[in-house]
Amino acid sequence: MKIGVLALQGAFREHLNMLGTLGAEAVEVRKAEGLPELSGLIIPGGESTTITKLLDIFGMAEPIKALAKKGMPIWGTCAGMICLAKELPGDISGVKPLGLMDITVRRNAFGRQVNSFEAMLKVKGLDEADFPAVFIRAPLVEKTGKGVEILSKLPDGTIVAVRENNLLAISFHPELSGDNRFHRYFVQMAKTYKA
């Protein structure tokens, strides 16, 4: 089983390191040719405009969409959540999301870099201990479709983690937390996928 981390831009090394703590075979993905051999793909945080443009330039958007429809697990963190969304309200100039998840996501919902914060969250599917979530220019989920399961919310009710079948999206950066439980959760999703 091989898990790919999209390595076009953003926090991909940190995801690779976190997967390494679990003994998972993790590879950097920069070309569409490497996608079919994967059991799962992580789209990391970074700059959503840049990531979506590079997905198009490198011819990866359509193959990723096709694999998602076949059931391959795909996990978007922060900017990766934006990439997976069907709808992005407001000014989204330059951002072309993959449109895979039935969610409406607002970019930079918590403000600028200086407004970054950490929060301890209860997360459905993880054990009872709270998860240390790191929010950096994070998006939030404004609306979910019928088939979308809400995994976590901030204390004020803001949705920050969702799952829709084989697709997982979270607002924050678990790769920066020092806690590998979210990565373990995704590895379990990937184990169920038959390429």
Curated annotation (Swiss-Prot):
The keyword Hydrolase applies. It catalyses: aldehydo-D-ribose 5-phosphate + D-glyceraldehyde 3-phosphate + L-glutamine = pyridoxal 5'-phosphate + L-glutamate + phosphate + 3 H2O + H(+); L-glutamine + H2O = L-glutamate + NH4(+). L-glutamine binds at G46, E47, S48, R107, I136, R137. GO terms for molecular function: glutaminase activity; pyridoxal 5'-phosphate synthase (glutamine hydrolysing) activity. This is Pyridoxal 5'-phosphate synthase subunit PdxT. The keyword Lyase applies. The gene is pdxT. In the presence of PdxS, forms a dodecamer of heterodimers. Only shows activity in the heterodimer. Catalyzes the hydrolysis of glutamine to glutamate and ammonia as part of the biosynthesis of pyridoxal 5'-phosphate. The resulting ammonia molecule is channeled to the active site of PdxS. Pathway: Cofactor biosynthesis; pyridoxal 5'-phosphate biosynthesis. Gene3D superfamilies: 3.40.50.880. Keywords: Glutamine amidotransferase, Hydrolase, Lyase, Pyridoxal phosphate. One of its GO terms (cellular component) is cytosol. CDD domains: GATase1_PB (cd01749). Pfam families: SNO. Its EC number is 4.3.3.6, 3.5.1.2. Transmembrane segments: none annotated. The active site is at C78, H173, E175. Belongs to the glutaminase PdxT/SNO family. One of its GO terms (biological process) is pyridoxine metabolic process.
